């Protein structure tokens, strides 16, 4: 064995590493304690910079120590000469770069660099752009570096066209770069501002076509990369709908006026203001939500005094003015009539689809054909399938309804982990289509049975519905938004999986409610029905609660105003 190098055993190596770690930890704790002691004593000098450098050089994510360095640098600013300060800043920038090499995604390091450059009279922004380019060359998805680059570009007033060209170079090198795609979505509206384009900033047709060609190259190259699909969705996205007062309804029986809006809003003295004019005279009223809770809501209502509803005049004119939304709506209650209303048409306003020009429709049709071609090559690509569904919705939801449902089935099979989300999205689209069909038929009856619905959406659009059939679906609850259905008289929700009735409250006209074959377990879940003053028929057959002894007597006590309860 003489003359041979001794090799440490694994136990010896482990022990050596343990001792080394203990030594490093001891030095780390000692240095940290010294820094805190000096800070507490107000000894903010260059020795603190040296101590924090030792720690941050190994662990750049110690936020408190970056705060200490800033405090020291602020004190040294007034003590050092301009030449000494310039040398100190240069050294600090070099130290920061070394920290970034240790951890390129260190929040504290990037923030400290922003702070430091913000205090310089003439920062070298070109150097900072070069620094960003170097780090993005190593990792083009480093969003910390992207944030810093946006800061630098803003401070240096770099033209958006130059930054767009920079994203071109990175995307060309690697399509899978979410940050580059996102940056493009910020830059393009700046380069091509469009009047009345909305907050999302729609693009001119020629620019849109060029971007679509670029993103198509991306998802045809790597169909499974989601970044290009997200950008594609942004390109074809719709602007937010304009603020609008959708429907105004007046009921003589309930002495109530109800109004629905395009978005939830909070009405009050310090928030949104609604003005009510009756026969061109202002009327002071108190606004409330259907469920009585003071929170943002699509639907608001108010009580009307008897004088505004009497039959002495041939008609009464009601006008609601939404001051913040710059919108108003007027309806007339004729003599001898019990109700009057005025509403926007979902078919005319295209509430559930993009508002498209002829050129844009042509573009979307072309995109749909391209995605179908890709789907033939990649039949199990979930992003492609979802995009096809959304494009069909944007083009013509009723024309493509049957085909859309087929694509949903395929998508659920491909992506079973998101089956519940897809079921809810499918339910949303089916309800939208049903609202459109109801308006085309000009009726107040809505049949949503046998549609396999899992959720109810857009209930604020059903303000005037009198009969609603939700039977044979997969609903687990009737949501609080159901209180928006102020005209509802008959509700059928048989053969679902309903466990809660919290949403069936304060429905002033509800007379018949059928809940056969659901999952209502305890009589207490029926308590909300007591708030429906005209409810006379309740069908609870084939629910678990019907098996309880004495259930008929219990329900009669719980709901004394309901004359017929079937169990």
UniProtKB/Swiss-Prot annotation:
Enzyme class label: transferase
What's the Enzyme Commission number for this chain?
2.5.1.60
Q: Check the record and name the InterPro entries matching this protein.
A: LRR_dom_sf, Prenyl_trans_a, RabGGT_asu_insert-dom_sf, RabGGT_asu_insert-domain
GO molecular function annotations of the record: Rab geranylgeranyltransferase activity; small GTPase binding; zinc ion binding
Q: What does this protein do?
A: Catalyzes the transfer of a geranylgeranyl moiety from geranylgeranyl diphosphate to both cysteines of Rab proteins with the C-terminal sequence -XXCC, -XCXC and -CCXX, such as RAB1A, RAB3A, RAB5A and RAB7A.
Q: Superkingdom, according to UniProt? A: Eukaryota
BP terms from Gene Ontology:
endoplasmic reticulum to Golgi vesicle-mediated transport; protein geranylgeranylation
Does Lyase show up as a keyword for this record?
A: no
A single Pfam family it belongs to is: RabGGT_insert
Q: Which UniProt keywords apply?
A: Leucine-rich repeat, Phosphoprotein, Prenyltransferase, Repeat, Transferase
Q: How does this chain assemble? A: Heterotrimer composed of RABGGTA, RABGGTB and CHM; within this trimer, RABGGTA and RABGGTB form the catalytic component B, while CHM (component A) mediates peptide substrate binding. The Rab GGTase dimer (RGGT) interacts with CHM (component A) prior to Rab protein binding; the association is stabilized by geranylgeranyl pyrophosphate (GGpp). The CHM:RGGT:Rab complex is destabilized by GGpp. Interacts with non-phosphorylated form of RAB8A; phosphorylation of RAB8A disrupts this interaction.
Where does this protein have coiled-coil stretches? none
Q: Where are the PFTA repeats?
A: 44-78, 88-122, 124-158, 159-193, 207-241, 363-397
Q: A cellular component term (GO) from this record? A: Rab-protein geranylgeranyltransferase complex
Asked if the Swiss-Prot or TrEMBL record annotates the protein with the keyword Lipid biosynthesis, the reply is no
Name this protein carries in UniProt: Geranylgeranyl transferase type-2 subunit alpha
Catalytic activity from the UniProt record: geranylgeranyl diphosphate + L-cysteinyl-[protein] = S-geranylgeranyl-L-cysteinyl-[protein] + diphosphate
* Similarity comment: Belongs to the protein prenyltransferase subunit alpha family.
The known regulators of its activity are described as: The enzymatic reaction requires the aid of a Rab escort protein (also called component A), such as CHM.
LRR repeat positions in this chain? 442-463, 464-486, 487-508, 509-530, 534-555
Q: Which residues carry this modification: Phosphoserine?
A: 98
């Amino acid at each position: 064995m003489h003359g041979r190098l001794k090799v440490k055993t694994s136990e010896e190596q482990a022990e050596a590493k343990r001792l080394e770690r203990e030594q490093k930890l001891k030095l780390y704790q000692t240095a940290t304690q010294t820094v805190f002691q000096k800070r507490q004593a107000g000894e903010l000098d260059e020795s603190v910079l040296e101590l924090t450098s030792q720690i941050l050089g190994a662990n750049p994510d110690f936020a408190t120590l970056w705060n200490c360095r800033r405090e020291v640098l602020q004190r040294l600013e007034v003590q050092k000469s301009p030449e000494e300060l310039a040398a100190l800043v240069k050294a600090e920038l070099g130290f920061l770069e070394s920290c970034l090499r240790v951890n390129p995604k260190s929040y504290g390091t990037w923030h400290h660099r922003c702070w430091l450059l913000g205090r310089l009279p003439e920062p070298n922004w070109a150097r900072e752009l070069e620094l960003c380019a170097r780090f993005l060359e190593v990792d083009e998805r480093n969003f910390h570096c992207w944030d810093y680059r946006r800061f630098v570009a803003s401070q240096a007033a770099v033209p958006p066209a130059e930054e767009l060209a920079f994203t071109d170079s990175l995307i060309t090198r690697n399509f899978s770069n979410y940050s580059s795609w996102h940056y493009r979505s910020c830059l393009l509206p700046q380069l091509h501002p469009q009047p009345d384009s909305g907050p999302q900033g729609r693009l001119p047709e020629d620019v849109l076509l060029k971007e679509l060609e670029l993103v198509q190259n991306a998802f045809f190259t790597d169909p499974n990369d989601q970044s290009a699909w997200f950008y594609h969705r942004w390109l074809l996205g719709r602007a937010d709908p304009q603020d609008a007062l959708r429907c105004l309804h007046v009921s003589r029986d309930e002495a109530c006026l109800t109004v629905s809006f395009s978005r939830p809003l909070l009405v009050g003295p310090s928030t949104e203001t609604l003005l009510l004019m009756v026969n061109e005279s202002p009327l002071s009223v108190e606004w409330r939500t259907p469920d009585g809770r003071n929170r943002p809501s699509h639907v608001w209502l108010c009580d009307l005094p008897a004088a505004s509803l009497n039959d002495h005049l041939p008609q009464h004119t009601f006008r609601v003015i939404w001051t913040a939304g710059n919108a108003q709506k007027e309806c007339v209650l004729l003599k001898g009539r019990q109700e009057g209303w005025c509403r926007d048409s979902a078919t005319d306003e295209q509430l559930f689809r993009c508002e498209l020009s002829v050129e844009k429709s042509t573009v979307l049709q072309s995109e749909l054909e391209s995605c179908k071609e890709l789907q033939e090559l990649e039949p199990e690509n979930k992003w492609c399938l979802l995009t096809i569904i959304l494009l069909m919705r944007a083009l013509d939801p009723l024309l493509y309804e049957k085909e859309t449902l087929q694509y949903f089935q395929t998508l659920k099979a491909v992506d079973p982990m998101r089956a519940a989300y897809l079921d809810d999205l499918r339910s949303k689209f089916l309800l939208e289509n049903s609202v459109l069909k109801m308006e085309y038929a000009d009726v107040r009856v809505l049949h949503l049975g046998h549609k396999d619905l899992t959720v109810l959406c857009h209930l604020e659009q059903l303000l005037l519905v009198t009969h609603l059939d939700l039977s044979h679906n997969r609903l687990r609850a009737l949501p609080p938004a159901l209180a928006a259905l102020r005209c509802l008289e008959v509700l059928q929700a048989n053969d679902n999986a309903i466990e809660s009735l919290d949403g069936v409250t304060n429905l002033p006209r509800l007379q018949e409610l059928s809940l056969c074959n659901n999952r209502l377990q305890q009589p207490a879940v029926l308590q909300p029905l007591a708030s429906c003053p005209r409810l006379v028929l309740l069908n609870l057959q084939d629910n678990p609660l019907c098996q309880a002894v004495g259930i008929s007597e219990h329900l009669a006590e719980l709901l004394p105003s309901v004359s017929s309860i079937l169990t």
